[in-house]
Amino acid sequence: MHPIVIVGTGLAGFNTVKEFRKLDKETPIVMLTADDGRNYSKPMLSAGFSKGKTADDLCMATPEKVAEQLNVDVRTGVHVAGIDATNKRVLLPDDHLDYSKLVLALGADTWTPPLEGDAVGEVFSVNDLMDYGKFRAAVEGKKTVTILGGGLIGCEFANDLSNGGFKVSLVEPMGRCLPLLLPEQASEAVGRGLADLGVQFHFGPLAKAVHHGDNGQLVTELSDGSQLESDVVLSAIGLRPRISLAKEAGLDTNRGILTDKSLRTSAEHIYALGDCAEVQGHVLPYVLPLMASARALAKTLAGETTEVSYGVMPVTIKTPACPVVVCPAAEGSEGAWEVEAEGNTVQALFRSKDGSLLGYALTGEAVKEKMKLNKELPAIMP
């Protein structure tokens, strides 16, 4: 009997195995990962400096421990070269692995802007525990960090690094914090909260180049001609679902790997979930949808075909300088924001023309309204 093969040992991969083992203790499972296979919580990567956590501190279990606890074969440092969907085979550089069912839990890649300069290779991004360890080593004993990108990850790192004692400069060309998630007044509240920690914002220009400076520092050149000096540069522009492996195997892809509500791809016996998946048009790189997907997929793998449903799934952004909870309206929703603001406390409600609540953004003390508002919202994907 060929094993279930899971490619990826992030939250999506490990949680699928945990849920599956509640239903089936014995079916062989092989997990393949290109990294070191340590189990950790990805959201903690942008909260580690405040708590003084090293990469080892954030590791919840070694691959050996996971293998023992969940009766699974975890193979680390493995590069998957391709998928032969016809013959149900994962292709490795010097071998292959036959599967009964294949789960793609590939995650997403960080997107780095097209920068010039002789220090481009020294720009960090933090997308996994190994990245975090390298970044933490790089900032050891340093004082200043330039962050490229003022979205969710950029703002979380700005807050975390400031709390960790670093002087932070943040570059965001769209002109405000969290521009794709929040209306303007809520963005401004987050900006004020971070500014109070000492974060210096550079709204409007793009980062063009990163050079070595004369004094050992890095110089980030912006499109308006200004220059920022810092010890370290961190790119937090955004994430792109990893789809190349699936695409090369002939699976249908769009923004992510396309699946139905049962997380089945266009190829028989192949499933996808988490940051790499596009489920019925939804790309939701957040923890709550991932956990719902893992529970549903575990049942399907155990023989009970189960569709995933996404209820109301608010996103909590870890910026304690100005707490944020947001529940974005579905893409293409028509409506308008109703905003009440007092200082850094903002309640922004996105309503349709008939007054139905379609989404919200809450900052400061208004985050306490989350549970009440959740009851009014429609499910993301019933």
Swiss-Prot record:
Cofactor: FAD
Amino-acid positions noted as binding FAD in the UniProt annotation, renumbered to this chain: T9, G10, L11, A12, T33, A34, K42, V80, E156, D275, V287, K318
Record's catalysed reaction(s): 2 reduced [rubredoxin] + NAD(+) + H(+) = 2 oxidized [rubredoxin] + NADH
Pathway named in the protein's UniProt entry: Hydrocarbon metabolism; alkane degradation
Keyword 4Fe-4S listed: no
GO cellular component, one term: cytoplasm
Protein's UniProt name: Rubredoxin-NAD(+) reductase
